[in-house]
Amino acid sequence: MTAAQAAGEEAPPGVRSVKVVLVGDGGCGKTSLLMVFADGAFPESYTPTVFERYMVNLQVKGKPVHLHIWDTAGQDDYDRLRPLFYPDASVLLLCFDVTSPNSFDNIFNRWYPEVNHFCKKVPIIVVGCKTDLRKDKSLVNKLRRNGLEPVTYHRGQEMARSVGAVAYLECSARLHDNVHAVFQEAAEVALSSRGRNFWRRITQGFCVVT
């Protein structure tokens, strides 16, 4: 797997291209997920994303695929700019922090309505990020003091079904756990009939990867 951040880099002739767009609340873990996948390094400090584009090459069924991955800003200040990056999206990753019930609720309340408006018929994958923090006792206790709990795997599955996603995946960028699987699944969904026909399958079963 190779990665580049040069905006002008395009797929070589004969290589399929897939545009992946990550959306979700600011700080939910989508940027760390992308950086670990593309560069192999976890960012120890948080810097809010404006908009970033990465190019990554991988294999799908033995054939090269060129991923154009867009990381979008989740802050309200960028609501008018974000839709500029949706055209021609092949697959959407709706990301949330499993230790942030608010970011989880926003998948249904904010992000799904937005992408459904601007990207009709584009397949969706819901991604639960920061799974390593489910075992952070300090964070869990803080949530419990406010009457909250980390988002469970089962609730993530239910959310994916509720927005008609083709898959639900969980990952930990810090532990490099399941990171590659997220983007491998995105590429495979974008290139398969599973992705092309997903809007007809909202009430049917979907793939779950942990």
UniProtKB/Swiss-Prot annotation:
Protein's UniProt keywords contain Oxidoreductase: no
**Which pairs of positions does the record mark as disulfide bonds?**
none
- Residues forming the motif Effector region are 46-54
Q: Which tissues is it found in, per the record?
A: Heart, placenta, liver, skeletal muscle, and pancreas and, with weaker intensity, in several other tissues.
Q: Which residues form the propeptide?
A: 208-210
Its transmembrane ranges are none
The family database entries (Gene3D superfamilies) matched by this protein are listed as: P-loop containing nucleotide triphosphate hydrolases (3.40.50.300)
Keywords on record: Cell membrane, Endosome, GTP-binding, Lipoprotein, Membrane, Methylation, Nucleotide-binding, Prenylation
Q: A Gene Ontology MF term for this entry? A: guanyl-nucleotide exchange factor activity
SMART domains per record: RAB (SM00175), RAN (SM00176), RAS (SM00173), RHO (SM00174)
What assembly does the database describe for this protein?
Interacts (in GTP-bound form) with DIAPH2 isoform 3, DAPK3, FILIP1 and WHAMM. Interacts with PAK5. Interacts (independent of GTP-loaded status) with ANKFY1.
User: Briefly, what is this protein's role?
Assistant: Involved in endosome dynamics. May coordinate membrane transport with the function of the cytoskeleton. Involved in the internalization and trafficking of activated tyrosine kinase receptors such as PDGFRB. Participates in the reorganization of actin cytoskeleton; the function seems to involve WHAMM and includes regulation of filopodia formation and actin filament bundling. Can modulate the effect of DAPK3 in reorganization of actin cytoskeleton and focal adhesion dissolution.
Name assigned to this protein: Rho-related GTP-binding protein RhoD
Q: What is the lineage of its organism?
A: Eukaryota, Metazoa, Chordata, Craniata, Vertebrata
